[in-house]
A protein has these predicted regions:
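Membrane-embedded transmembrane alpha-helical bundles that form the catalytic cores
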Residues: 1-463
């Protein structure tokens, strides 16, 4: 079930909210957990077993570490092996068999394994909890209900952000519910829904038009690349906004996942602003334990390439994702070793540097396969014998110009700053007190109309 769907918005969420706020505080976690299990099992109930198994082993090994501290390293290894084996089988077994068959020429069976929704997210949450217990960062949770609620909580279950146990442990035990928090959460949710439905979905239509085009051109390929970058951003950040907003309504404060990444002047800065919870997870649980940057240059390079290769692989079991991660590894290493300091000289230089790199990266990320990625990236820079523009490219540029401009502005802090300036004046604050609720209602109505119409409603990170 997607947040941006009629069943969720009108059949699931309203009764869950009503039941949750009617429930006494001591039973709120149980209500939230049961609601989350219904949410997760809505489409494929059998996948509940995978998630419940992940929760059970995380809880068991956390308790075993507490009871037998001498053997906690063994328990950590066993827990990690179980978690990663389940993820590896479900998500990567088919990919590795295909790769092995291609390399060796062997006729290996083609595995068709259904991927449990959100397994990459909840696996990382369980792993981080067990590692933190091992390190002594957090005490083991003795209440299975609280740990299960942390892992299975539907606002962040299928698409993050990757919430660490320490981030919300106090709120699992006791949290405050206020009208202010609920209103702020609802506002954040509706804005995220608008980003997802009215911008990301519309941009996906432009991307689909390019992929089906019989008149490709350099201009059309650049339109596609820009649409890719903006669509993935509004798709995922919109979903993250909805998750953070829902968490706020239920009394939780989830970490932010995006901070205007397209304003970045380097790849290093970009990954401090893009999918922050994933980047910080790999930093704290893979990169630093490997030695981070406090080691020899060759070891540091190995660490960087390993972490970024895994980051790419986390996003999908395909070589374009692996190369996408390694592409950022090369850039990250080059910035640190050679030209990173030079980028700081002028703001214009930094953004001119990032523009083609982001275009290449998002085309590679979204490509159906490596040959398609190669053709599209070559077309960006005028290779392949394509014309500079064509009838189709000019038609789609005119047709989607308004959405592209709105998306480009929405990817900057300008709208938020404008609203804040209004809020800082008495007259502006009075206007916003009326205009903001009306605008949110109209935005929700527009999103609902789009969804009722049966328009295309994809979500890329749903597959992770």
């Amino acid at each position: 079930m997607l947040f941006s769907s009629i069943p969720f918005l009108f059949y699931f969420l309203p009764p869950v909210l009503l039941l949750y706020f009617l429930t006494p505080d001591r039973w709120k976690n149980l209500t939230l957990l049961l609601s989350s299990l219904v949410f997760y099992g809505w489409g494929e109930p059998r996948f509940l077993l995978f998630m419940l198994a992940a929760i059970a082993q995380g809880y068991a090994f956390g308790r075993l570490m507490e009871r037998y501290p001498r053997h906690k390293r063994l328990f950590l290894i066993l827990s990690a092996v179980l978690s990663l084996s389940l993820l590896g089988y479900c998500k990567y077994a088919g990919f590795f068999l295909r790769t092995l068959g291609a390399l060796t020429g062997l006729s290996l069976p083609a595995l068709q394994i259904a991927l449990p929704i959100g397994i990459s997210f909840y696996t990382f949450q369980v792993l981080s909890y067990v590692v933190d217990v091992y390190r002594g960062t957090v005490p083991p949770q003795r209440d299975l209900l609280q740990l299960a609620t942390y892992v299975a909580m539907f606002p962040q279950l299928i698409a993050g952000p990757i919430v660490r146990y320490a981030d919300i442990a106090p709120e699992l035990t006791r949290r405050h519910h206020t009208l202010t928090d609920a209103a702020a959460g609802a506002r954040r949710f509706v804005v995220g829904l608008g980003k997802k439905v009215l911008i990301a979905n519309v941009l996906y239509e432009l991307m689909s038009a390019f992929l089906q085009s019989t008149q490709p051109s350099v201009l059309f390929t650049w339109l596609y690349a820009v649409a890719c970058a903006l669509q993935i951003y509004f798709d995922f950040s919109g979903y993250s906004d909805m998750a953070v907003g829902l968490g706020r309504i239920f009394g939780f404060h989830f970490p932010e996942n995006f901070r205007y990444p397209f304003l970045s002047g380097s790849v290093t800065e970009f990954w401090r602003r893009w999918h922050i919870s994933l980047g910080s997870w790999f930093r704290d649980y893979v990169y630093i334990p490997l030695g981070g940057s406090r080691c020899s240059r060759s070891r540091w390079l190995l660490n960087v390439f390993l972490v970024w290769g895994l980051t790419g692989l986390w996003h999908g079991a395909a070589w374009n994702f692996v190369l996408w991660g390694l592409f950022f590894a090369v850039l990250r290493a080059a910035e640190k070793l050679w030209y990173g300091h030079g980028l700081e000289k002028t703001r214009l230089l930094k953004h001119l540097y990032m523009l083609p790199l982001l275009a290449v990266s998002f085309v590679l990320f979204h490509a159906a396969d490596l040959p398609a990625a190669g053709q599209q990236i070559a077309a960006l820079f005028g290779f392949g014998g394509l014309p500079a523009s064509g009838v189709e490219s000019l038609y789609y540029l005119r047709s989607y110009a308004v959405v592209l401009v709105i998306a480009l502005l929405g990817a900057t802090p300008l709208p938020a700053k404008a609203v804040q300036r209004l809020r800082n004046t008495s007259a502006g604050s009075a206007v916003l007190s009326v205009a903001e609720p009306v605008a949110l209602v109209l935005l929700l109505a527009a999103c609902t109309a789009y969804l009722v119409d049966g328009s295309f409603n994809p979500f890329l990170y749903f597959r992770f």
